[in-house]
């Protein structure tokens, strides 16, 4: 049993002495918990009197190129196929101007390795500049116009997606040629219609299809192209993508 001790309090009232019970471990534990609960109650009353302040979101400044790279240079190399040498040479001024002036990067075309090389330097301020420049050059190499590819530098929510027609349906010979013709349409009418409705840009290079746009728009354009490959008539595909586009416009 726990030992019980009696102690007289100096503040006695009416001639009666106040008796406090002191026990063993349990009593000491209760006495230690009482002050902490009193402090919590006092803090709660103080907090009730104060006005509730909304929590502020932490603001982190963007990383600078110098602090992130810490003196190390990063490089990206984009191979250039033979059929894109002439367009690259003709549009070289339009390509390197935004990369050098706006992104603060260094760019060159290596004649030996046939690669476009981009690297960071002291003037690079944005950490994502190298990735944006590489995507911009890659989009031009795939066949997009310089004006369309520039959107990859200006906007953050644009992406590139590539797939092959044979990934959707294993076609060969004349069947593959007809599938390519259904995607393009007479004079490119079908391709232009899909681009305008889905707000994307499409490049049809042999059996490869490249789509430039936002995630949701790429999904709509890819669905329409896959339906054409599988044999759906263009009129039905037009109706489907217009319905999906109108629902997306109403939602936003």
Swiss-Prot record:
CDD domains: KH-I_PNO1_rpt1, KH-I_PNO1_rpt2. Residues 173-225 form the KH domain. Pfam families: KH_PNO1_2nd. InterPro entries: KH-I_PNO1_first (IPR055212), KH_dom (IPR004087), KH_dom_type_1_sf (IPR036612), KH_PNO1_2nd (IPR055211). Keywords: Acetylation, Nucleus, RNA-binding. Part of the small subunit (SSU) processome, composed of more than 70 proteins and the RNA chaperone small nucleolar RNA (snoRNA) U3. Part of the small subunit (SSU) processome, first precursor of the small eukaryotic ribosomal subunit. During the assembly of the SSU processome in the nucleolus, many ribosome biogenesis factors, an RNA chaperone and ribosomal proteins associate with the nascent pre-rRNA and work in concert to generate RNA folding, modifications, rearrangements and cleavage as well as targeted degradation of pre-ribosomal RNA by the RNA exosome. Positively regulates dimethylation of two adjacent adenosines in the loop of a conserved hairpin near the 3'-end of 18S rRNA. This is RNA-binding protein PNO1. It comes from Bos taurus.
